Amino acid sequence: MSVRAESDQLHELVDANAEVERIGTGFTFTEGPIWNPRGNFLLFSDMPGDTRRRWDEQSCITEVAKPSNKGNGMTLDAEGRLIVCEHVTSSVVRMDPDGTGGGREVLASHYESKELNSPNDVVVASDGSILFTDPTFGRMPGFGIERAQELDFQGVYRIPPGGGDPQLLVDDFVQPNGLCFSPDESLLYINDTDRAHIRVFDMEDDGSISKGRVLADGIGTGDLESGELVDGMKCDEHGYVWVTGPKGVWIFTPSGEYLGIVEIPEGVGNLHWGGPDWSWLFVPATTSLYRVATKTRGRREPFMS
C-alpha cells in the first residue's frame, strides 16, 4: 500500500491505490527535480555523482551535464531559463533551459564579501525575485567539497528582481532546506532539517518576511546519518504542503494538519509536479526516480504561463 491516510481528505488529493512507479534507477543521491513545460522533460540532480540528468517519455534517462558542480535544487524563471543551486561553487546560477551549462551566469555567490555556505533549494516569485536556502550540506564530503565555513549562520536569501546582491531574510535556522510559496505568494514555507519542522512566514510587499511560526514538526529525526529527514517541499494548487520526510512524501493542510503519506521505497530528497497536465508527482529518492499520479497539481509558478 503506497498511500497511508490519517484523514479521508488525503484521498481528494491522491488515490488510495495510487501506484508508485520507478522510472529510473542506478544513481547515487537524486535531488532537485524541475519539469520543463516547453520541452516536456524533467531535469534532476545527482549531487554525489556530480551529474545532471534528464527524463522524458521517449528517451527515458539521459545525462546532460557532468560535472555539474554538484548541483542541487533547481527551478525555472519566467523566461524558462534554468536556475541551479551549486554546492561546489557555493552559488546560485542561471543557464540555458536544457541544463547542459550553456549561458551560465552567477546570480549570487557571496553575502557581505563572505562566500555563501552551499545554496540548497530555490524558488522564483511572480515579481522575478529569487529566494533560496543556504545550509552547510555542500561543505560536507560527498555532497560538495569539504571546506571551512565563512559565514557564521545558515540563512535564507532573496535576490531582487533584475538581480543584485542577495538580501538576508532570516538567519535563525539550523539547516534551512526546502522552501515554497503558497499559491497566492502571501506565505513562504521553509523547513529546517535539524529541527525537523516547517515554519511559515508572511510575505511583505517589500519582499521581506515576518511573523514566523511553526506549521508542523516531528518530521524525521533531524539526524543526517539516519536519513530520516525533512527535505524538499512544494505547495499544490489548493495550498496543501507536500514535504519529503521519513518513508516518503508527507502532506499537510495549510493550517498544519497532517493528512498522511505517500510511501516511497527509498529515502526521498525532493518532489515536483509535471507531465502534460501537471498531475504527475515526480519524486527523486536516493538511487532512483519515481512518479505518482495525483488528483492535484503544483501551485502555478511564473514559468508555467
PLM-predicted stretches and their roles:
Residues 51-53, 91-93, 154-157, 197-199, ...:
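A short loop-to-beta-strand structural motif that recurs across blades of beta-propeller domains
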Residues 19-24, 59-65, 105-112, 165-171, ...:
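A short beta-strand motif characteristic of beta-propeller blades
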Residues 1-21, 49, 209, 301-305:
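Blade/loop signatures of beta-propeller domains
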Residues 132-151, 294:
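Short, conserved, GDST-rich strand-edge loop motifs in beta-rich repeat architectures
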Residues 47, 87, 135-137, 193, ...:
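Short loop/turn segments immediately following the C-termini of beta-strands
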Residues 270-305:
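Blade-level signature of beta-propeller repeat domains, shared across WD40, Kelch, NHL, RCC1
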Residues 97-99, 200-209, 294-301:
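Short loop/turn segments immediately following beta-strands, especially the blade-tip
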Residues 25-40, 67-86, 91, 112-130, ...:
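Beta-rich, blade/repeat-based domains predominating
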